[in-house]
UniProtKB/Swiss-Prot annotation:
Protein's recorded name: Dermonecrotic toxin Hl-PLD1
Lineage: Eukaryota, Metazoa, Ecdysozoa, Arthropoda, Chelicerata
Cofactor: Mg(2+)
Family membership noted in the UniProt record: Belongs to the arthropod phospholipase D family. Class II subfamily.
Species, as recorded: Hemiscorpius lepturus (Scorpion)
Gene3D superfamilies: Phosphatidylinositol (PI) phosphodiesterase (3.20.20.190)
EC number: 4.6.1.-
Signal peptide per UniProt: 1-35
Chain positions recorded as Mg(2+) binding sites: 70, 72, 130
GO cellular component terms, semicolon-separated: extracellular region
Pfam families: GDPD_2
Disulfide bonds: 90-96, 92-236
Compartments, record wording: Secreted
Amino acid sequence: MAHCYYNSKRGCNRVMKTVALVVLISTVMVEESRGDSQEDKKRPIWNIGHMVNAVKQIEEFLDLGANALEADVTFDDNGNPKWTYHGTPCDCFRDCLRWEYVDEYLKRIRELTSPGSSKFRKGFILLMLDLKISKLSDNAKSKAGKEIADMIIKRLWSGSGEKAQLYIVLSFPYVNDIEFVRAFRERVKSKGFASEAEKRIGWDISGNEDLGKIRDAYQKLGITDNVWQSDGITNCLTRSHDRLAEAVCKRDSDKEWPSLKKVYYWTVDKQSSMKEALKVGVDGMITNDPDDLVAVLNEFSGTHRLANINDSPWQKIPRPKSNC
């Protein structure tokens, strides 16, 4: 029992209250530390809302629990980015024709991801741009890389006000599209934003090509970090998990693929498929129903959680026990 040697009862009470408060705060801090430690052991998951191409859809998907969004970027024949637009055909049960001008879309993204904005959404941490460039000539792909770099610099990283805090994954279908990457990287370097790009920009080749071929393409480009790898198919069809599991194994191994940091699956709408993908070891999923993935993560709350802004999308997190 604590003893008080102050002359007044009031002084003694103050001391006892202070001691009690210190004990309470210390206890809370210990419990929070334990809680944080337990949270750190859970795999952070990127819940990526699919085909969010109209400005009005952005907050709709965020309100459903998405912490990341995917938008399609369509170009003219010369490589100028025009619209966030998918077109037909697209996933089952979706409107394929929603769109916005790319410039206007990115302006809205900045409003939602700049901490000083009245519209700031703390939980919105990543934007994936699905670049529709495969039918372009190499010259047009190069133009597309420069134009996208200019738009990101102008709309998200420069000008008055705070810059956007979110991360960006630039996704394109095939290794033959890498002229875009060369041009993008050269452009951000020439504009003085190379360090910002290294911090904020990642890459994904999404066309289900051979994983070794994809890894070699990155090595040829000199990309040694910030790589995501996807596997998937439209929600209208089913697909084996063999290639997905192979990608997860390569992520888990620094020797196999050092630059590969995250693996995600697309497009996943059934809760049963979401559960299977989590068991395989993915870091994220593209879904038309982010609220369903939130529900699944609640079931997996002992081992998984939604990623937040403190989680780096460029950090490799191997599984504790590998099945490779």
